[in-house]
Regions:
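N-terminal amphipathic/basic-hydrophobic helices that include classical n-h-c signal peptides
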Residues: 1-19
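Coiled-coil-like amphipathic alpha-helices with heptad-repeat character
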Residues: 3, 25-28, 171
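Intrinsically disordered, low-complexity regions enriched for glutamine and histidine
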Residues: 6, 68-69, 150, 223
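Hydrophobic transmembrane signal anchors and adjacent membrane-proximal interface regions, especially
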Residues: 7-10, 43-46, 156
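Conserved P-loop/Walker A NTP-binding site and adjacent catalytic elements of P-loop NTPases
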Residues: 114, 121-236
């Protein structure tokens, strides 16, 4: 009773609150993703013929979002094998000598600068100037023929055999080792030739199984002015 005016209830107290926490469970550490970026960078040191296949395997592994130690180990082994093959080929590159009396020898620095700076180079010169025999040697000196062969086409079989023999002789190598040739019914190439002479028809036929001709890092189309059907297809 307060002042006779009625009952007044005491202010209700707030209910007690309790904080309930569950025991903390440590979040399992997510396994680290394999370092694919460094493996993609290693492709530059592989054979051209291996790069596309290995890049596709790495891309599939990256896009899957999963860790596959077995596949990663297989890719690493393939990268190592391809890089070792490149190193072995580089160690076999000879130091070429050039006959001083040939016009191509006199202009070799100019030609090499053009080869270094441009994807496609047209070399014109008189018959006997040394284009056919010296261009592959110029390419070898630039470091070509290592990640793939230097392909060198001739319009006729006899020319392919003769030129291969001459270049091999100038490099001081038995025919079929550093320099080989392939014509119809006859293949004289060792396991790891740096330069391969062939008819233009042979090279064109290889596009069936190697559409981008990744077996080669350089291709020389000799006698291109003859403009045969095979040569036109190759240039295209």
């Amino acid at each position: 009773l307060r002042d006779g005016r009625g009952l007044q209830s005491a202010p209700a107290s707030a209910p007690p609150t309790y904080a309930v926490t569950a025991p903390s469970t440590p979040t399992p550490a997510r396994p680290s993703r394999p370092d694919l970026r460094s493996r993609f960078a290693r492709l530059d040191g592989c054979m051209l013929a291996d790069r596309g296949r290995l890049a596709a395997r790495l891309a599939r592994l990256r896009d899957s979002g999963r860790d596959d130690p077995q596949e990663l180990a297989a890719i690493d082994a393939a990268l190592d094998a391809s890089a070792a093959r490149v190193a072995a080929r580089r160690a076999r590159v000879p130091v070429p000598a050039y006959p001083e009396d040939l016009p191509v020898s006199e202009k070799r620095r100019t030609i090499q600068d053009a080869l270094r700076d441009h994807q496609v180079v047209i070399v014109c010169g008189e018959t006997g100037s040394g284009k056919t025999t010296q261009l592959p040697k110029l390419c070898l000196e630039l470091g070509r023929g290592v990640t793939g062969m230097i392909g060198h086409t001739q319009p006729r079989r006899i020319a392919a055999r003769t030129v291969a023999g001459r270049i091999a002789q100038e490099l001081g190598s038995p025919l079929g080792e550093l320099v080989g040739y392939k014509v119809r019914f006859n293949d004289v190439t060792g396991d790891e030739p740096l330069v391969k002479l062939m008819t233009d028809g042979i090279l064109l036929a290889e596009t069936v199984n190697d559409r981008q001709l990744r077996a080669y890092d350089t291709i020389i189309v000799d006698e291109a002015h003859e403009r045969s059907l095979n040569i036109d297809f190759l240039l295209g």
